[in-house]
Amino acid sequence: MSLCLRLLCSVCGAAALRVPLGVSSLRALSGSAEGFRPARVAVVAKTTRYEFEQQRYRSSGLSEAELRDLLALKGSSYNGLLQRYNIHSENVEHIVQSLRKEGTDVRLVKRRDYDEETVRWADAIISAGGDGTMLLAASKVQDRFKPVIGVNTDPERSEGHLCLPVRYTWSFPEALQKLYRGEFRWQWRQRIRLYLEGTGINLTPVDLHEQQLSLEQHNKAHNSQLEQKSVAVSGPQLLPVRALNEVFIGESLSSRVNYKSCKPRFTFSLHRASYYEISVDDGPWEKQKSSGLNVCTGTGSKAWSYNINKMSSQSVEELLNIVRQHKSLNVSLDSDVIQRVTNAYNDSLVYNPEEPKMFFSVREPIANRVFSSSQQRGFTSKVCVRSRCWDACMVVDGGTSFEFNDGAIVSIVMDDQDALCTVLLDD
């Protein structure tokens, strides 16, 4: 109930929570009242599954016919992947040509070519893909006055929560005209920053989207930095990434057991709980074992965090039946009531992306006489975690990973200067 009330209060006060723009900020962005017409735009296009499969087997010298046969063996449709690629490519071209017709200087880049220099060059960034591409585009933007706009290039296959409404996929010039006329408002999506300290830490990030890397190669990417590790650092180090959706902390490869015999070595992967200590809002430290810890923003409250915490109508019905038995409540539990209660609870898990607060969730906590979980989820302004793990990672927006093993300490906070500038077009 308290969670519902907090969300109700936050919704009622949403307008007051918008980050204010000063005079210099308005001048830097040419505020929405004046319209926004960027001279240079970087369009970041996603890598489709078809392109990925081509890149993956290019080194093997496979022809298109051989690739088609290989995909069929894997249960994938070559024609289907090619069709989605063509749809995406046509919509990307629609975006690029619409911008160029307006005299905008456009730079079209893929994931591997998207870097800090491209971000500095551009007045605005457009992600052409889905939510994953939007997260990628946002990941390299540190300037809170550089807008990032998402366009869903394949609405049939991508939800696109972070993108413009679907109709602008095919009518992008209409979206541009609304920007030029100032028919929109800036939306400042709060992001999470991370301070890492402790012993044996590694500040080198690994890009998890480099899908050409095998699992073994991924480990080598981490281990190749061992020589650069410091046994301890003098103080907290601010990591060079910001989380738009969430930060997840947990064991990555569980436990691995190698067996040697006359046969080739093989590996078993068994589940290992994540062991850590946690402090919420500078409160007392608490030892926990769980399947990991998720800390999200208002933007991320609709994503993984929502699916971790949401309740099914079946669970709600069972709980209400127990309450009715113990409290002698004379309440009709028809399907409509159950569904309304379910929706009310699940809706309370989602909050405004502009609110400067986080929501943490402990996944499947273990509770016994040694380990406890006094609070499994809740809103917070600061979370500190001390790792007691052996093979753990701290993953930012599902795309960037940092080692987070025994002795490492992370402080998870928000800062207004990290807010990501996006737009909400007027209806």
Swiss-Prot record:
This is NAD kinase 2, mitochondrial. GO terms for biological process: NAD metabolic process; NADP biosynthetic process. Mitochondrial NAD(+) kinase that phosphorylates NAD(+) to yield NADP(+). Can use both ATP or inorganic polyphosphate as the phosphoryl donor. One of its GO terms (molecular function) is protein homodimerization activity. Its main location: mitochondrion. Coiled coil: none annotated. It is found in: Mitochondrion. The gene is nadk2. Keywords: ATP-binding, Kinase, Mitochondrion, NAD, NADP, Nucleotide-binding, Transferase, Transit peptide. InterPro entries: ATP-NAD_kinase_N (IPR017438), ATP-NAD_kinase_PpnK-typ_C (IPR017437), NAD/diacylglycerol_kinase_sf (IPR016064), NADK (IPR002504), NADK2_mit (IPR012355).
